[in-house]
Amino acid sequence: MIQHIVIPTLGRTHNQITYKNLPDNLKEKVYFTVQPHEYDEMNDIYGDKVLKLPEEIKRIAPTREWIFNKFNDTRHMVFDDDLEFVVKEPNPGEGTKWLSRRFTDQDFVDALDLVDGWMDEGICFGGLLPAWVIPDVKQWPVRENQRMMTNWFFNGPELPRDIQWNRVMGGAEDFDVNLQLLSSGFK
């Protein structure tokens, strides 16, 4: 079972979009990671859900590394702080047009059950396709080995501890982490 949802956030103290879009039962699993200068205000609002990053961490790649190391003994998810959860479904008879709707509480249950099932089968990490990518009806609803917007879930106990989170151009760390894990035989 997914134990934690971690939301790294910056500059959204009073506008936690992802958190507001989660059902109440998932809000109980949420932790926010924040820069030290935002900690007190976030703590006043969200209490012990707020984790203060060390002073030396200023960018997202080191933040993601810190999150991975902090939660590496758990099954956890890492969400951006501005997510809206949308389902795209085929629109029969409309060619390439798709129907979009917001996640329901049941969609969240189904999504987490799907991820838990994948982890039980040995899949250790994965992500989501961005909503603006038009799905392929032949592969709907799941596309394997496609571009991910960001890493979304980790089965921490099954993953190596020597991932390098910031070894390339100072960006694209999610893609690089994916390649490191895939190159090491993880799926």
Task: Go through each PLM region and give its residues.
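Conserved glycosyltransferase catalytic-site signature
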Residues: I60-E65, G171-N178
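Short, high-confidence coil segments that cap the C-terminus of an alpha-helix
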Residues: D73, D120-C124, F186
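Active-site-proximal specificity loops/subdomain of glycosyltransferases
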Residues: T33-F79, E84-S100
